[in-house]
Amino acid sequence: FVHEHLESFIEAEIHEDAVSFIDLINVVKNDANIQQAWQNKSRDDLYNASKSWYQAINKNHRITHFYFHHLDKTNFLRVHNPQRFGDDIGRHTLRQAAQTQQTSFGVELGTFGYLVLRIVSPWFIDGQLVGYIELGEETEHILEKSSATLETNIVTLINKDKLNKNEWLLRTAEPDQDYLWNALPNHVLVDSERIKSSISNQHGRFELIKKGLNPQLKGELSKDQNDYFFTGNFPIVDVAGTTAGAYVFFSNISAEIKHNQQ
């Protein structure tokens, strides 16, 4: 049951990362310079006080998103993108943190189709709730680790109805981006590096993915030219309980097949 092993492995890795990021947020909350800049409502000072934090946690912990939010859930500062601020944040993790006054975490879909593990924590200074701090990491490295540990390959497919096509096309400079959007009827492939290393022909890759997307199957044997693959899928369910897409896995089992045929 490859899908069950993959699913439980990914969930465990996500939880492990989330726990470590909660510790990071707690350290940031208590930084005196960050607290002072927030209380002064100085965006420039807050950026200057927190950018070294971002550089360190980006390098050491793969954090790609770092936010400070107002109590009304509007964004005050994106440390990773300081030119953009002032927008309403409607994500489930922030709403949940605001409702419960507890740290919230889970995987959510980003604007450009990337899955992001987000951790949002209420921020208290001298016992008073002043805002929310959010950290996020794109989850691609977890799939890399899953593939290596369980000796299979896994790719991420996102439902097209969860994406804005024009925004998605802006995310990549690849010349065949229109082909990539249209290659599958209901999904787009987020990352293809692993499958590229296994199947060099682009048409063959998508044919294998289509077989792996068969909703009736937990896994099946597929043939691509002279290679045999075991393929299957399981749904990507975000923290709000919405199905955002599917993970498709494939294992090249040609050696085993040929050995058994001898």
Where are these regions (language model features)?
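Juxtamembrane extracytoplasmic/periplasmic/luminal helical "stalk" adjacent to the first N-terminal
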Residues: 1-44, 48, 52-64, 103, ...
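Amphipathic coiled-coil signal-relay and dimerization helices
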Residues: 36-37, 70, 74-81, 118, ...
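Extracytoplasmic/periplasmic ligand-binding sensor regions of membrane-associated signaling proteins
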Residues: 55-136, 144-146, 213-226
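Soluble periplasmic/extracytoplasmic beta-strand elements of cell-envelope proteins
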Residues: 67, 153-155, 248
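Conserved beta-strands of PAS-like sensory domains
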Residues: 114-148, 230-259
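Intrinsic low-complexity, intrinsically disordered coil/linker regions enriched in small/polar
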Residues: 141-226
